[in-house]
Curated annotation (Swiss-Prot):
This enzyme's EC code(s): 1.14.-.-
The entry's keywords: Oxidoreductase, tRNA processing
GO biological-process terms attached to the record: tRNA modification
HAMAP family linked: TrhO
GO molecular function, one term: oxidoreductase activity, acting on paired donors, with incorporation or reduction of molecular oxygen
Organism: Photobacterium profundum (strain SS9)
Origin organism lineage: Bacteria, Pseudomonadati, Pseudomonadota, Gammaproteobacteria, Vibrionales
Gene it is expressed from: trhO
Residues annotated as the enzyme's active site: C177
Pfam families on file: Rhodanese, UPF0176_N
Domain Rhodanese: 123-217
Family: Belongs to the TrhO family.
Name listed for the protein in its UniProt record: tRNA uridine(34) hydroxylase
Amino acid sequence: MAQYVVCALYKFVALEDFEAIRQPLTDVMEKNKIRGTLLLASEGINGTVASTREGIDALLAWFKQDQRLTDVVYKESFDENQPFNRTKVKLKKEIVTMGVEGIDPRHVVGTYVKPKDWNALIADPDVFVVDTRNDYEIEIGTFKHAVNPETESFREFPEYVEKNLDPEKHKKVAMFCTGGIRCEKSTAYLKEQGFDEVYHLEGGILKYLEEVPEKESLWEGECYVFDGRVAVDHQLEKGQYSVCNACRLPITDAA
């Protein structure tokens, strides 16, 4: 039975005192033997951590003490081993780096689509489906009908939009990512660029894999995750990939 709970979490929220939050957050993580990395910025919090059930519950309880973080978005999966080596709380300019000033998902964002409704949306031929993740993530798994922007980092996404998407041509755009945070910013960016009907998968791929039965799923392959598991399968269990020691990209011995 899996011993560790892996918790991916984020929330876009005004945290003017984010620098002051760093130490008490580090303290609660260390006290409860929670490993992983959390990012703090004036726009919110983001990261993935792992611990025992009790440790993760203690962290979530700590968030509830701050009314700004009581409804932090989180998704859980499990691993037999601790997938992280260290405990880190970092201060950043953005909790997910797009590099474009003024994009604020708290003020404008696309339409959330529940996992149970996602299949019907992306099967619609009038909907242009974009995977907002990096190229190496997409190579090991993505949704049917999805376009690969072939980006190496999220910073390249605005350039992809500028060169390849047109509000007059692409009337309906649906986007997805691992846990939902990149889609928050990417849909906010598209709305700012004049796109009207913009949708994104609520809770990301991880929530979809959790809620949609595999026999009904339009997901193909495995889902890359930013921890020692490298990828998870449709049951959210560690997949067949490992990390190449030379290039640091996911590899598999499977035929």
